[in-house]
Each structure stands twice: as structure tokens, then as C-alpha cells.
Amino acid sequence: GGALLALRAKSRGVSGELTNGCLRDADEIAELGFPVYCAGTFPVKSARDIETIGVNVPVMLGGVQIIPGDLILMDRTGAVAIPADRIDEVLKEAERINAREAKMEELIRQGMSIVDARKVK
């Protein structure tokens, strides 16, 4: 889709888009503050006939099944779907990893090699 579709989605309360398709108007969409993770960009407009085939239904994206209630986290480098029943577990592990990487970053800034920083518990 393009900027108009993103604007419409945002105005309807959609917090972002994750698609295995392409998009156009990437700069305009970024200016909207509407995050999109997609397969790529394509400058040609989309077909005029857009049909909703489901809302709050399971979908497959990139070989991963996403079920309503799953937590989707994405940035410019990728996206991850966390099953609803594992959100707490995964977020605790992410906090542990972030704390470890923050410690490693400090050690590297102090001159330690990455190899040695990885060995520190």
C-alpha cells in the first residue's frame, strides 16, 4: 500500500503494518509515524480493488503463524511475533539480554575486546 492506506489505517487506530508484500510512498509513511515492516518497496500504485478477507484471524507471514493476541515487535531491521502465552517469559529474557549487552558495551568502551567482554558474566 501507500501513504493514503497508511493514513487510513492510522486514523482507524492501527498501530503499524507487518506485511509480506511491498509498499510505496515509504518517505510519506515514515512522516506519518506509522511503522511498516514489509518485503520491499515498489513504486507502482496498487490495484484499485482492495478487499478485506479477515479481521483478527490467524495469518502466515514469512513462514510464521501469527494469531490475534500475539505481540509483534518490529524495527527497521526485522520483526518478531511473540505468542500471547509466552510474552512475559520472552520479555524477561529480553531484559536479561539487554542488561548483559549494556554491561558488554561499557566494557568495550573501556577498551576491552568483544571476545573478552563476551566472557564476562
Model features per residue range: what roles?
Residues 1-68, 82-115, 119-121:
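Feature captures the catalytic cores and cofactor-binding loops of soluble hydro-lyases/lyases
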Residues 72:
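C-terminal binding/interaction regions
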Residues 78-80:
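Channel- or pocket-lining gating/hinge segments that regulate access to a cavity or pore
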